[in-house]
From Swiss-Prot:
Keywords of this entry: Amino-acid biosynthesis, ATP-binding, Cytoplasm, Kinase, Nucleotide-binding, Threonine biosynthesis, Transferase
Catalytic activity, reaction form: L-homoserine + ATP = O-phospho-L-homoserine + ADP + H(+)
Residues involved in ATP binding: 82-92
Native source organism of the sequence: Bacillus cytotoxicus (strain DSM 22905 / CIP 110041 / 391-98 / NVH 391-98)
Gene Ontology biological-process annotations: threonine biosynthetic process
Gene transcribed to yield this protein: thrB
Pathway membership: Amino-acid biosynthesis; L-threonine biosynthesis; L-threonine from L-aspartate: step 4/5
The protein, known as: Homoserine kinase
Subcellular location: Cytoplasm
Top-tier EC class: transferase
Molecular function per GO: ATP binding; homoserine kinase activity
């Protein structure tokens, strides 16, 4: 069984008004190579010292919450998901930890059980369900019960605009109001409802319109991401359907016609030459375990 590899896609959440509910898996990946058993957990990773390399690492701590009796191993982490940029890096780590426990502990978890555990650890299903299932997901958690629906959106292209600066999710949540008026909540939820219906019916122009009319979080978080209005304006000018914060930000998420994604990305690169612009795919595989690998390290 050893070694084996777990691959988990990145994700974007909200897609505008689908706050803490709508997520989409993206073609950036966290890979975890599980190596030999050792007396103590050890994580080889490419990040700075703020990311632990022992059992306090989020991947390992998640695995141990799922199965406390797991034997310790060396694991190597390879990732091109930027940290604290709104692209689901923590959700990917949580999903990897659950799959690590599932494989090493021979738990035979169902997909629904993985989603339930991941939502329990993350607090909301959007990112984690997307990383587990792939594709686009709409999820809800109510009194501990998690419901998720997966859809495919293969006509869509995705562009991510990734600023250099980090934005901690807790900081981004701090600017949100604790309550809304009834009238505000009705307006906000109606926009979210139309977004979801348009995603299901593949009404992409309506998706783009709704993702730019959010009332749940973007009006408050946009002050932390001053790049949003100008990127939104240019993306629309170049033919994109719509632009929104990716999760809590600071990255921006742009939906385009699939066949035009490269051209739109290239035009944005010319306008914003100092900012990373990534042409991505929607990932449709979700978490994948590969037992047929060799490790020469």
């Amino acid at each position: 069984m050893i070694p084996f590899k777990i691959r988990v896609p990145a994700s974007t959440a909200n897609i505008g008004p689908g706050f803490d509910s709508v997520g989409m898996a993206l073609s950036l990946y966290l890979e975890v190579i599980v190596k030999e058993e050792v007396p103590h957990w050890y994580v080889i990773h490419p990040f700075d010292q703020s990311v632990p390399n022992d059992d306090s690492n989020l991947i390992i701590s998640t695995a141990l919450q799922v199965c406390p009796s797991l034997p310790s191993h060396i694991i190597e982490v390879i990732s091109n998901i930027p940290l604290t940029r709104g692209l689901g890096s923590s959700a990917s780590a949580i999903v990897a930890g659950i799959e690590l426990a599932n494989q090493l502990g021979a738990l035979h978890l169902t997909t629904d059980e993985k989603i339930h555990l991941a939502t329990k650890f993350e607090g909301h299903p959007d990112n984690v369900a997307a990383s587990i299932l792939g594709g686009t997901v709409i999820g809800a958690i109510d009194e501990g019960h998690v419901s998720v629906v997966r859809i495919e959106s293969k006509e869509l292209g995705v562009i991510s605009v990734i600023p250099d600066e980090e934005l901690n999710t807790n900081e981004s949540r701090f600017v949100l109001p604790e309550t809304f008026s009834f009238h505000h909540a009705v307006r906000a939820s109606s926009i979210s409802n139309v977004l979801v219906a348009a995603l299901c019916e593949k009404k992409w122009e309506i998706v783009g319109e709704m993702m730019e009319r959010d009332l749940f979080h973007e009006p408050y978080r946009s002050q932390l991401v001053p790049l949003l209005p100008s990127v939104r304006e240019y993306a629309k000018r170049f033919g994109a359907y719509g632009t929104a914060l990716s999760g809590a930000g600071p990255s921006l998420f742009i939906l385009t016609p699939y066949e035009n994604r490269q051209e739109i990305a290239e035009q944005l690169m010319k306008v914003f030459p100092k900012i990373e612009v990534c042409e991505l795919e929607i990932d449709y595989e979700g978490v994948v375990v590969n037992m047929d690998i060799s490790v020469n390290r």
